[in-house]
Amino acid sequence: MKTMQIKDLFQVTSGNKLDFGKMATTENGVAFVSRSSRNNGVVGYIEKIGNVSPFESGLITVSLGGTYVLSSFVQPTEFYTAQNVAVLRPLVEMSIQEKLFYCMCISANRFRYSAFGREANRTLKYLEVPTREEIPEWVSSATIPDYSHIKKVTHSANSILIQFLMGSLGFVSYLILNTLNLWCTRIQRLKKVV
């Protein structure tokens, strides 16, 4: 399999390095991405900061340290980041399926790091991932359904769906489901604002 380094596919930047505890939170604000491995790394929503532009939607965030080092997510809305979160901007246009595939590839390198030991801040851009030509065909043919019409997925229904997907389709489906659930939540919040 042909591989290349992350830096040859993405522009790697260090994010905003903000402290969530010092931000003014609001339910309908800008997503705040930390090193969390849950909810696409989003720990809350904050008011826009006048002199700091949020990152645009569609970029990948990567946790550079902590227990879930290299947790990687495609952000469906604009966002700010905490410390130790990298932001990856594709150097060429990529589909959401390709971005999710690279999130999976990045996260799969977690074993190279230890929580609160070796962190990824210096080495992320040198991680080897498959070239775009090596992406399996099923990735580009995967359909990501539009769940924006669903108001709320109950916890039990969500758990059953996750169990089914984990057993039948594997980890990539889980990543896609996580992203879709987050997008649905954010779309509903945006509808409330408008």
Segments predicted by a language model, with ranges:
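A short beta-sheet element
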Residues: 44-105
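A common structural junction motif
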Residues: 108-111
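A generic structural motif
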Residues: 114-120, 150-154
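Short, recurring structural edge motifs at helix starts
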Residues: 18-22, 113-116, 128-129
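Structural beta-strand/beta-sheet cores of well-ordered domains, especially the beta-sheet scaffolds
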Residues: 16, 28-33, 58-60, 84, ...
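A short glycine-rich beta-alpha junction/loop motif
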Residues: 79-86, 116-138
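Intrinsically disordered, charged low-complexity linkers and terminal tails
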Residues: 82, 90-92, 96, 129, ...
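Non-catalytic DNA-recognition/assembly elements of restriction-modification systems
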Residues: 1-19, 23-39, 132-194
